[in-house]
Every structure is written in structure tokens, then in C-alpha cells.
């Protein structure tokens, strides 16, 4: 039997499980103002890695958070439902959602096209990317953030 070819991904920053284990998160506010003090954008209680600057926070929240259509979760991570049983939708509220959206999409397309040697390699790829995005070791070009 032929050995499956594909990308092997060794972990450097993460261990199997939660790729965010070694990252400290905090709630912040993001506010963008005009020179005259008028508010262009404001969003409160967003979750960001604690090592990020306020400028990085403002860029992430104002430019790259999805502003609508995202299932909302309660404090335990359960999807909120309205009185009809439909998902309650709203904005992204955590940079984890953005990192997950990107890394999971890249993994999906990599697996779909046979890019990885195994599903474990695909998981390692996803986890390592999530960590690198959260620690600002890597970042895609701007259009990737919006998709």
C-alpha cells in the first residue's frame, strides 16, 4: 500500500487540545474617533489577547470583526435561541472567533484538496495558526480577514 503523501505539520507552539491555553485574554473597549471627537465606531466588552496594543485592538474590532450574522452564545458557550427556536444572531465579540474563522477555513480547504498527510496534521496546522494569529506572529493579507 502506498504511503499517503501530503504536508506533515509538527507542533511548535501548541499541544493537542486548546491552542489558546497559554494565552491570557481580557475584555476591552474599542473606540475610533474623528479629530473633532465625534465617534466613528465603538464596541465594548470585546475579548482580545492581553498582550495586544490598543491600536491592534481597534483595528481588529473595527475592521475585522463580523458585525452581523454570527450566532450568539451564553456564558457557557451554548447557542442562544429566540422564542421561535432560531439562533440569535449578532456581531463577533471575541478575537478568538476571528482566529477560528480564518484557521478553520484554511484547514477546510487544505483537507478538501488533499493538502495534508493526515487529519492530525490538519489539526496541528489549524491549532498552530490560531496560536500564531493570537500572538501576532502571523497575519494574512487584508482580504482574508473579511471572508
What is the meaning of each model-derived region?
Residues 1-147:
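Extended catalytic cores of very large enzyme megasubunits
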